[in-house]
């Protein structure tokens, strides 16, 4: 009897999770499938899921679009995202290792203060002062100034994950390296970094997703420099660009292309992502 109840509960749970997954994925699937429709079909029959005739013309038009430079925006997004990923990895790993193994006064107090500052979101409270400071040093335009901002706005969750992972490593490895004459910095780069590859992959994927999908700050910083717009900013701008605003086929095709890099990054680092996320959450 207990086995039957357990099986029934599992069946109900799996059905619920299946429905939940379908509800979450349906908008993405609808956009991807609709990107192969003609614009007239999208406007005439938006309720149709499958197109009557598949066409790749939308992707060709997006790539060669006169309304916005898709290739340039793709390049901007890649450069911005990769720089942000590098910054996140460097700051997260360096800060986490310093707080775990570093020996200095008021370490716990400094960590709490550091965490409190990082927890402040980049909302209306912080955007204006930050923009005003960058304006004073002439870095308030374009993605270069935004990359400087990223040095001081690393998500605290990344530091917590790396910190928990490092705490799970046996300290005897570092003691042996110290006896052999390795410095604090050498231990970090030659021993710790190779050992924490799974959590580094997790931080990289989370950073890639967040930076690639970021809209608010790139919009503010590239408002006066259209040539440095990212893909997300460009697609939203396409929606309000007069004649192009009715070109839903182009917007859907562009949106589908925008999602692909995130899917590719996750598929490449999936194995490390799961193990790193689980291990990094054990301690902290």
Regions found by a protein language model. Name each.
Residues 2-284:
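A structural signal for multi-pass alpha-helical bundles of membrane permease subunits
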